[in-house]
């Protein structure tokens, strides 16, 4: 028999550059744009499992250069969890390590596994790890001040101008490029949308449990909602600490590996595979009025966020009309 396959499932919690708060100036949406484009990891964790879901290794550390720097950590969405981490440090449940120490262990483990991935590999492996790696390299160089000045200009544009994709930027959805090496990359989110949650039962659970996107157009497809469905524990909430979340995501992967081979590559917007809530309700012979009204109410409220005549408002108004016709 050949060597058993192994899978590294990664998760992280991120902050962003300290200049984000200044540039956003209290605008949460602007800060969010910067945080997504310029993530800095402060909580780094992964779980290595075999195809049966047996845990071969767990690793977790807090990054000294980000967690222990208030100007950085205070930009984090979950900055209020700092006391939780401090208690974990006191109890010996986590440790502070500098980035390059963590990367040494991470690099060794990457060489032992067959595949690497995360619930949102596009963010974790294509943005969070590469940008934190870049940040640390600049932090310990003589050119940091100049680099930060350039980032200030870039972050202002990110916050204040429409997004423009760089057509020249190389993007290979099938591999994680790290320190001169390539590793086959999977995406738990994409696999879940294909193999685990694209079911009538899941979609009805979303409608009954308020697990909808902010606009009501799509079903939620997060690790949290997927795990709720897997365990039938609809009160479950993710801890939003990296190791706990990686363990949950590893369980989701293991469930799918029982019937399917790992899918290499990142599919953009995998939630679209489930279709829209309106399409689903229209396909039902006798959709429950309660479910129709739930989506209707979410969309009716959301449309207020868009000006009259804008394309997305018109789209929501069209959906609303279709839902009214189902009543």
Language-model segments: which ranges?
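Short amphipathic alpha-helical heptad-repeat segments
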Residues: 285-299
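Short, charge-rich amphipathic interface segments used for partner binding and complex assembly
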Residues: 315-326
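Acidic carboxylate-rich catalytic motifs and surrounding loops in phosphoryl-/glycosyl-chemistry enzymes
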Residues: 60-63, 190-193, 234-244
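Charged, low-complexity interaction regions
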Residues: 303-314
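Conserved DEDDh/DEDDy metal-dependent 3′-5′ exonuclease domain
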Residues: 79-199
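Conserved non-catalytic scaffold segment of RNase H-like nuclease domains
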Residues: 2-8, 12-129, 133
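Acidic, Mg2+-coordinating catalytic module of metal-dependent nucleases/exonucleases
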Residues: 115-122, 126-127, 131, 204-289
């Amino acid at each position: 028999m050949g060597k058993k396959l192994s899978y590294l499932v990664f998760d992280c919690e991120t902050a962003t550059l300290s200049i984000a708060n200044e540039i956003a100036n209290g605008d949460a949406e602007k800060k969010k744009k910067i945080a997504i484009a310029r993530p800095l990891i402060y909580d780094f964790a992964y779980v290595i499992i075999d195809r049966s879901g047996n845990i071969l290794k767990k690793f977790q550390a807090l990054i000294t250069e980000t967690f222990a720097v208030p100007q950085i950590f205070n930009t984090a969405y979950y900055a209020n969890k700092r006391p939780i981490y401090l208690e974990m440090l006191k109890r010996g449940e986590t440790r502070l390590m500098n980035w390059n120490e963590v990367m040494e262990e991470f690099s060794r483990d990457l060489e032992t596994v067959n595949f690497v991935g995360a619930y949102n590999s596009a963010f974790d492996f294509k943005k969070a790890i590469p940008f934190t790696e870049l940040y640390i390299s600049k932090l310990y160089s003589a050119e940091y001040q100049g680099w930060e000045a350039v980032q200030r200009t870039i972050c202002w544009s990110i916050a204040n101008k429409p997004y423009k994709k760089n057509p020249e930027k190389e993007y290979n959805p099938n591999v994680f490029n790290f320190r001169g090496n390539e590793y086959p990359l999977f995406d738990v989110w994409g696999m879940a949308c294909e193999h685990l949650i694209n079911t009538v039962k899941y979609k009805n659970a979303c409608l009954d449990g308020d697990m909808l996107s902010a606009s009501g157009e799509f079903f939620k497809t997060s690790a949290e909602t997927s795990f709720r469905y897997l365990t039938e524990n609809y009160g479950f909430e993710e801890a939003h600490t990296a190791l706990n979340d990686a363990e949950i995501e590893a369980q989701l992967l293991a469930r799918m590996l029982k019937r399917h081979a790992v899918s290499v590559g990142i599919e953009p917007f995998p939630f679209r595979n489930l279709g829209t809530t309106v399409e689903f309700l229209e396909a039902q012979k006798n959709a429950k009025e309660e479910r129709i009204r739930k989506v209707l109410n979410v969309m009716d409220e959301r449309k207020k966020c868009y000006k009259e005549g804008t394309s997305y408002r018109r789209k929501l108004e069209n959906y609303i009309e279709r839902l009214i016709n189902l009543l």
